[in-house]
Amino acid sequence: MGPTASGKTELAINLFEKFNIELISVDSVMVYRGANIGSAKPTDDVLSNYPHHLVNNKSLNEIYSVAEFCSDSLQLIQEVHSRNKVPLFVGGSMMYFKSLLRGIDKLPQRDDGYREALMKLKASEDSHYLYNLLFLKDQDYARVVKPNDEKRIIRALEVINTTGEKMSEQINSGSNLTLFNKYNIHQIAIYDQDREMLHKRIENRLSIMLNDGLIEEVKGLVNRYTLKEQHPILSAVNYKQTINYLEGLIDRKDLFNKALYASRQ
């Protein structure tokens, strides 16, 4: 795991060449076919030589949830072990990592009807309405979630609505379900002490994405697929900002600056 442009894929490839491992992607966007440039998906040549599980598995007509990722990952761990290999998870979707490690077995499936009701409430109220609602229902979880992190706020409210339990309670009560009790887990985190250099790499990569056709890619995906309002790609870094640009909400300069800012968080 590590921040954007920190060299996760390169390190994973080096480890693949040296050890008896299989790579499993931990990325909420790379799992979708066609979402290539904006997700910095490895090229077809790289994927051919260094296969990644959970890359190009889903159509954008589908919504791939955290619960599905955890279920798929647990199955893959068993399959990889059956081949006498070690699974190496690589990616930057921290919610996926945390959910897999801490356990998500007790969390309910998504409720699209309830989510739509929340979005209607948000549209009729101010931008922080959902966060304030979460704060009233689960202060402990609200304190660790950013007020603009709509995805996690909606999920927490959904859990409360479905189970009657707070998300903070669910996480704590699920601590005995973690992978740490079943497997020997080694976590590798890439930490770049030179933040200025890291930010420069992020900026360069975003420039390359735009030159390689990020806007054209997103335009093609939006025209081809009917994306539900809750679809993860609509809130994904690079895709969210490009869609806003295509809708005329921001100009190209703002697209770059907003995507750059989001990538640095």
Model-derived features: where do they sit?
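Phosphate/pyrophosphate-binding catalytic cores of soluble transferases and nucleic-acid-acting enzymes
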Residues: M1-R264
